[in-house]
């Protein structure tokens, strides 16, 4: 019996050894975790900057770009702050702060330049497959909201980035811009709208697939599908050991060593960062919020609307909850989406685990999470109200933006999961942070992107920021500086306030991407600024 026990133990140890294979090869240059637009963008940058580097990408699903990057899992708005009212806030003194809107727009201009470069390099093909002009509108009703929108419009005109925006309180003009929004509306209701004709709809799923298809042409790039990262550890030589489970091979585990690691796993990024054990993660937590959209594909409905119309968020609602009715171009076809309607799930990914939230709780982040819950009753009340909504309630919400809507034309779909960042705060104990944030190890060799909106629209500038933190020595070299300026001609420049630079960039990228160009003109009495030389040559 003793011999049988020893034999059985030996078989168990042997089986365990077979299940986990330690790869004793030289470290790869970088591991990208997650097959979405962020990892694809970083991989594309690095392949241009260091063609000889070895890059391994690990994606847990059968296909890439199936979570937040998928076109049906996000709003597809090219976030440029043209229509999103939450990027401009009203101060107690009554003035409108446009600093966030300017920053978001500058970031989107960087993305446009990067995409235009990739089209010229034939890395991205057929721009209309991933980006199309759809005018961006803000639409409000009620005296207070109209006053705010007028103030916002006036404030934005001080920025060269928002020249060409139109404002109207004339119902007939607004009907020409967005007939579905006005048809059937109470004629006595006072309304106002702004419109930016150069707004865009972006299919980030299609873009990601094209970027990865180009990367796979290089022998140094290796894409591993159905590979789940289960652990990340720091080695004595300051490299990283990344343990992965191959679910296409019975969960067989192996360990790969890397000099650098980027975690771009969407909602799952927080728990992956926690596995690394770096002290910088202490105090970070995540609050998952899901979303649903009403979708219409009836040509008679879809054909009468060509705009992304954003309203004003409810009091206490998170920025990502701003109601909007959008023209979307997905899989080559037009559709209308209205929402989002918030949902709650403890999953950090749409195809994640119900235990994600609970697995992310630690002694360091439990207090910040509890403080956020206590300090955000408005958000909690909003979420509860959303969860209790009936089909009739959703139809009534839709009719605020499309008065003649009938439920027969619409169906409800589940969008992607977003995980809002919660971080420790010395004063409040914990704060809920909207937007995205890069968190890195002290030496920058491991970095992660946390958060949500504006997200994919600003992938190019976010990855530029990450390049500077991960590759501190390389980014200052002449070779990298030249290449970065080739890929993003305004790199190192401030676009806002430079009328000539604004127009040069927009004209060049519009021509390459097949988009509408609107000249930014000086205000009355404002001198035209100097022309930035060399942009067209660089583009």
Swiss-Prot record:
Keyword Glycosyltransferase appears in the UniProt entry: no
Superkingdom, natural source: Bacteria
Pathway(s) this gene product operates in, as recorded in its UniProt entry: Carbohydrate metabolism; tricarboxylic acid cycle; oxaloacetate from (S)-malate (quinone route): step 1/1
First-level EC class: oxidoreductase
Transmembrane keyword on record: no
UniProt GO MF annotations: 2-hydroxyglutarate dehydrogenase activity; L-malate dehydrogenase (quinone) activity
Pfam family, one: Mqo
Alphabetical keyword list: FAD, Flavoprotein, Oxidoreductase, Tricarboxylic acid cycle
A biological process from GO: tricarboxylic acid cycle
Cofactors required: FAD
Catalytic activity: (S)-malate + a quinone = a quinol + oxaloacetate
UniProt xrefs under InterPro entries: FAD/NAD-bd_sf (IPR036188), MQO (IPR006231)
EC number: 1.1.5.4
Signal peptide interval: none
HAMAP family, per the entry: MQO
Protein family per UniProt: Belongs to the MQO family.
Protein name: Probable malate:quinone oxidoreductase
Gene: mqo
